[in-house]
Each structure stands twice: as C-alpha cells, then as structure tokens.
From Swiss-Prot:
This is Golgi-associated kinase 1B. One of its GO terms (cellular component) is Golgi membrane. It comes from Mus musculus. Residues 57-517 are extracellular. It is found in: Golgi apparatus membrane. It comes from the Eukaryota. Residues 1-36 are cytoplasmic.
C-alpha cells in the first residue's frame, strides 16, 4: 500500500488507518451499548467536521482567486471551476487527454499579475541631493537677489527666454528711511547666472473674454504696466511724499514716459481714492483722468498699498503756486462759464478773455468733483463746506480768504501740450466720509449744462454693477478696501450723491447735453 500524495487522500488514509483498528476493537469488546454508540458518534462527528472545514477552505480560496483576477477581464482567464472536485482528481477537458492532473491552486496563482522588475521599497533608493544656493548678505548700497527655483531655471532654459537686465543706477536716499529695491521674478542681474521666467500672474485680473467696455485696450495695458513692471529707481519730487518711480520697460506706442522708460507717481496710502476716481471717470464716459492702480512695493517698510498714477510727459508745464497750466481766478472762471468759450466751434471774441479750454470741460469737471467732493481745484479755501482740522485749507490757514472769493486762484487746472482744448484731471483725492448735509455745492456754481453720458449712467440702475466690475480688476485695491463689503460702502456714498445731483439738476433747470465735441 502506497502513501497517497494528494492532500485529501492523505487525510483520509491517515484517519482510516488510525481509527479502523480501534473501531473494530471497540465494536467487538464487551462494553455497554450506550457507551459504544456515544464513542462511535463522536468519531463520526469529528470526521464530518473535518470534511466541512475542507469544503469551506476550498470555497474561500476560490472566491479570493476570482476577486484577484485581472481588471480587464479577458476570456482567456475564465475557467469553469464548478466542475472541478474539491480533491483535484479531475482535470479540465483540455488537460484530461494527456493524463496530466491539475492542482486546485494552480489557476489561482496564474491569475495574479507578475512584476517585470521588483518595486523600489521606500528607503532602499538613495535620494538625489539637491544643490543649495547660499544667499550672501548684501551691503547697504547693494541689491538683494532672490534665489530662483531649479524648476523655473529649467523652464527658462527650455523656452530660451531672454530676460532683460536692470537699469543701472543708485537709489536716491530719502530722509532716514532705508529704501531698497528687491529684485522680483522675471529679471536677471548682470554678472549673475540666476534667472527666472518672466511669466507671472498679473495684479490686474480679467477672467472674462474681454475687459469692461468703458476701459480701452490702452487703459488695460497701462494698468498692467503700473501694476506689474519692476521698479528701476525712485526720484523724490515733492515734500508731501510723492515720488516718481522709473519702471522697467519701453515707451513704445502711446505710453508716455519720463525719458526712455515709463514712469509712475507714487503717492501716500491716504490717496487711495485716486484709484476709485479713475474707474468712476471711465464709467461716466468722461475720460479725463490718468490710469491709476494700487500696488504694494517691497522697498516700503510698512507694506501698505499705495496708488500709482501714470506719468504723462505730454501734460503742459504747471506753475509753482497754483499747479496749473493756465492761471484762472474764481471771478474769471464765472465769466468764462457765461461766455461759453469755443462752444459749437465758435471762435470767442478777444474781449471775452477766453482761454483755450472748451466750455464743456468745466461741466465735466464740476460733476466729477461733486461726486467725489474734490475741493482742491475749484474751492481751495474750503469756502463751500465745513472743513475738518486735517484738511489742507485749515492746515495752510486759507479759510480766512473766503470773504473775497473772486480773487481766489483755481488750482490743478491742467491741459495737454498737443490738446489745449481739453482738461486732464490730476490730484483726484476724494472724500467719502463727508455727510450729506455738508456737501460742497459751490463746485456746481455757474454750471448750466451737464454731460449726457454721465447723467444717463447716474440715472440708471447699473452704476453699482459697473463699479464693482471695474474695481474688481485691481486686485490690490479690492483687497485693501476689505473686499466687496468695503467697496459696497464706497459705492453707497456715490449713489446717494448721484441722487442729490440729479435732484439739483432738475431743481435748477440745468440742461443735459451730449458733449462729444
């Protein structure tokens, strides 16, 4: 008798050889029938339990092998296992002819996917050492370089990007505050092989297919120039803290500059209303202000955003006392309004003492100044409202000159050299905290006509929507005012003043005319 080599036959042979003599001896011995039946039943129960455990084990392995099958589910791996016995004595039809037998776990093993090469176990592969760049401490009069990433360097090399160098020069020292230029992304210093790609996200965000219709392509280009261009140098131009920023770039096209490079006027954080004034001017269809954006600069220690206004070299030179290209007193201004100089192409008479400024320009300026309550042009002495202690007219002691208003000189009346008929609105610092019972109606004195394009926008219900859409483009300004909640409060003030202005126009019988001369 040979010993079987299969697991099922081996177990059966072991049980039969071990238990058969004992069962025969037990059956032939003289013992009580009850005890003999109990022992026989116990042995049968043990053997039956063993068979059940073998059946459960085979079913569990078959289920696991089916679940571990390949995800593509090709038919070549589908084998009819329902006809294979548990002990594996019967092979599939295609293997029975050659007399070979099939092990019950052979099919399960072949269903597993095989690796072509062993996997890399974490910790067994030596990591690549990254090259580190040590940033040397810069001297007080030297520039600070920012270490670029290796990925950005490779991207720049792959694109063969030629990064322009910086304008050489020294930073002008202003007072005791340390001003320094931090080299931002997209630049390369001479003598250094550290470079970064020029592409970066602009602070002027346009998520739609096109910009708002009231902003021209030239406006968007100039806004991005002011918001994203690197600063080459700084020149102080006034005691009030206004500085001239020389920006990197070219003055090609219609971008005016202060030499070979474009420039921008950097003002104080309290002048942030100039950004709002620029967008309001474009929405009303006046187009008399210079592009203005809000920006944070690295060389300013407080980190607060400040307005930057485009420097326009085409503006006519201004006098030192009134900051105007033409000297006009309040009395002369009222006479010019009555004469309606250059209206309908009519040449004024010499005795009228008309300037080269068109009559409609005064109406546009008065409407614009009233909405923002700008008093530094038509009411420099603050005679039309109750000023605060921090207002310039109180600080300079000009309030006492209100008794003789006819001799008061207007300020910030600016024209262009090549276009003296039209005004350019500069220094547009507005005031949103002035109550409705303290509005300066002196700004509207003598005005009998108002521009139709602006009045139609004020009468419509779209002023808020347009202001939100336009101011959203300037990300730094939007965030500096507290997001939409803060912008909504500013728009509330403008809407209330617009309703008051419409009431004033109707009450005084002023005409609303198209002013597209």
């Amino acid at each position: 008798m040979t010993c079987p080599d299969k697991p099922g036959q081996l177990v059966n042979w072991f049980v039969c050889s071990l238990c058969a003599p004992r069962v025969c001896k037990l059956w032939s011995s003289r013992r009580p029938r009850t005890r003999r039946n109990l022992l026989l039943g116990t042995a049968c129960a043990i053997y039956l339990g063993f068979l059940v455990s073998q059946v459960g084990r085979g079913s569990f392995q078959h289920g696991q092998a089916t679940d571990r099958g390949p995800p593509n589910g090709h038919d070549i791996f589908k084998v009819p296992f329902s006809e294979i016995p548990l002990d594996g004595t019967l092979a599939p039809p295609e293997l029975q002819g050659n007399g070979s037998t099939l092990q019950p776990n052979v099919v399960y093993i072949t269903l597993r996917s095989k690796r072509s090469k062993p996997a890399n176990i974490r910790g067994t592969v030596k990591p690549k050492r990254r090259k580190k760049y040590a940033v040397a401490s810069a001297a007080p009069d030297q520039e600070v370089l920012v270490r670029p990433s290796l990925i950005q360097q490779e991207a720049a090399r792959a694109a063969d990007a030629e990064v322009p160098g910086y304008v050489q020069g020294y930073l002008t020292k202003v007072g005791e505050r340390p001003w320094r230029v931090l080299r931002g992304p997209g630049v390369r210093t001479r003598g250094s092989n550290l470079q970064q790609p020029r592409a970066r996200e602009s602070n002027i965000r346009i998520y739609s297919e096109s910009a708002p219709s009231w902003l021209s392509k030239e406006d968007i280009r100039r806004m991005r120039l002011l918001a994203d261009s690197e600063v080459a140098s700084i020149l102080p131009i006034s005691k009030s803290g206004t500085r001239l920023l020389v920006l990197e770039g070219s003055t090609s096209g219609s971008v005016p500059g202060c030499g070979p490079s474009p420039c921008g006027l950097l003002k104080q954080p309290l002048d942030m209303s100039e950004v709002f004034a620029f967008h309001l001017d474009r929405i009303l269809g006046l187009n008399r202000t210079l592009p203005s954006v809000s920006r944070k600069l690295e060389f300013i220690q407080d980190g607060r955003p400040r307005p930057i206004i485009l420097w326009d070299s085409s503006l006519a030179s201004a006098s030192n006392d009134s900051h105007s290209s033409v000297k006009i007193t309040w009395g002369t201004y009222q006479r010019l309004l009555k004469q309606k100089c250059w209206l309908n192409g009519r040449v004024p008479r010499p005795e009228w003492d008309c300037t080269e400024i068109h009559h409609h320009e005064w109406s546009k300026m008065a409407l614009f100044d009233f909405l923002l309550q700008i008093y530094n042009r038509l009411d420099t002495n603050c005679c039309g409202f109750r000023p605060r202690k921090e207002d310039a007219c109180i600080q300079n002691g000009l309030r006492s000159n209100c008794e003789d208003q006819t001799s008061v000189t207007l300020a910030h009346i600016i024209q262009r050299k090549n276009d003296p008929r039209h005004l350019v609105f500069i220094n547009n610092k507005g005031f949103f905290d002035r109550s409705e019972d303290n509005l300066n109606f002196k700004l509207l004195e003598g005005i009998r006509e108002f521009p139709e394009s602006a009045v139609s926008v004020l009468k419509s219900q779209h002023l808020r929507q347009k202001l939100l859409q336009s101011l959203f483009l300037d990300q730094v300004y939007w965030e500096s005012q507290g997001g939409r909640q803060g912008i909504e409060k500013l728009i509330d003030v403008i809407e209330r003043r617009a309703r008051i202005l419409i009431t004033y126009i109707n009450a005084h019988g002023a005409r609303v005319l198209p002013m597209n001369e």
